[in-house]
Regions:
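Recognizes extended acidic, P/S/T-rich segments that occur
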Residues: 41-76, 88-94
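Pro/Thr/Ser/Gly-rich low-complexity, intrinsically disordered linker/stalk tracts
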Residues: 1-37, 75, 88-114
Length: 114
C-alpha cells in the first residue's frame, strides 16, 4: 500500500467581476467567490479592450477577499481585467473579462443624490 498525498482540486473561477473607475487614477474591482478551497485570487490587467490584449498579473488578495483597488492606472485609458482563484493545485479558469475607461485626471465620479 502506497501513501499518496492528493492535491486539492482546482478552485472554481470567480464570477460577476465588475470594474468602476474612480477619478482618473484608480479602478475598483469586485467579484463573487464560487466555492471553497481557494487560497486567494490573482488579478490580471491588459491594456485595451477585451481578451485581445496580453494580460499581466498586477496583484493578489487572500482567501474570501472579493475586492481590489488598482491604483496604477493612467487617465483616459482603456483597461481590461480578469481574476483567477488559486490553490496548491494551480489557478482556476479566469473570471469574465470586464473593460473600463478611466476618465481624465481630476474627474470625480458623480455623487449620490439623496
Amino acid at each position: 500500500m502506497t501513501n499518496r498525498a492528493s492535491l486539492p482540486v482546482l478552485p472554481q473561477a470567480p464570477v460577476d467581476l465588475i470594474a468602476v473607475a474612480v477619478g482618473g487614477c484608480e479602478v475598483l474591482l469586485a467579484w463573487t467567490e464560487c466555492g471553497a478551497g481557494g487560497l486567494g485570487f490573482r488579478i490580471e490587467r491588459a491594456d485595451g479592450i477585451g481578451s485581445a490584449g496580453l494580460f499581466s498579473e498586477i496583484g493578489g488578495v487572500g482567501p474570501h477577499v472579493t475586492a481590489f483597488c488598482d491604483g496604477s492606472v493612467k487617465p483616459r485609458t482603456i483597461y481590461s481585467y480578469r481574476v483567477h482563484a488559486w490553490n496548491a493545485s494551480g489557478d482556476s479558469s479566469p473570471s469574465n473579462v470586464v473593460e473600463v475607461t478611466t476618465p481624465r485626471a481630476g474627474t470625480e465620479p458623480p455623487a449620490d443624490k439623496d
